[in-house]
Amino acid sequence: MFAECFENVRSTCPLIHNITNYVTVNDCANMVLACGASPIMADDAAEVEDITTICGGLNINIGTLNSRTITSMLLAGKKANLLGHPVVLDPVGAGASQLRTDTANRLLREVKFTVIRGNISEIKTLASGAGTTKGVDADVADKVTEENLDSAVAFAKTFAARTGAVVAITGAIDIVADAHKAYCIRNGHPMMSSITGTGCQLSALTAAFVTANPGHP
């Protein structure tokens, strides 16, 4: 299945609109290019609806959040929904500040997401409406382990059912779930926590894949 999905990205070369954070914007653009899709990184409210219209999918990342981009995210997200385009949410740092938590919750209320990808603390914050994170990293107390994996999977499936989105919780063990089934992935490496941007790049990559493979969200 992966080979087929990958080939679909390369053969269709979908244009992906990324409203993402300034720390990793270049890395995300290169990741989208490397997989065979095409990125555009427009975040001004005056043009985001136009840009979303010409794109196939939208990636929203709240990593370097500000009042200007909040407006842009809402405009682009609603436009994408109107057009039937897939939308990915990366709620970076949800729970670290009231602004981030409130914005992530508002996005969930006003935009329909195809995929929600974040670390376990961020996803728990979205599920409860409040929470705490260690900056943009997952709280150690929330870490998904083999011992608590069953409960983490059940949580992911419940949140997926509530939102109608595929929920991807990334960490030492990744969980990808919809309301009915879940997959656990154990291909991570401790060094990934020593650099910034791997999650942001994954969200951008996810947007490219779900856009090119509408039958496999």
Question: Can you describe what each PLM-predicted range is?
Answer:
Residues 100-182:
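Conserved phosphate/ATP/ADP-binding segment of small-molecule kinases
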Residues 69-118:
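Glycine/small-residue-rich loop that forms an oxyanion/phosphate-binding "nest" at active or ligand-binding sites
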Residues 58-61, 86-91, 135-139:
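Short beta-strands and strand-loop turn motifs
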Residues 48, 94-95, 122-125:
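Short gly/pro/ser/thr-enriched loop/turn and capping motifs at secondary-structure boundaries
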Residues 20, 68, 95-96, 147-148:
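Residues that cap or flank secondary-structure elements
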Residues 1-74, 79-81, 86, 153-217:
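Small-residue (G/A/S/T)-rich helix-start motifs and N-terminal tracts that mark the onset
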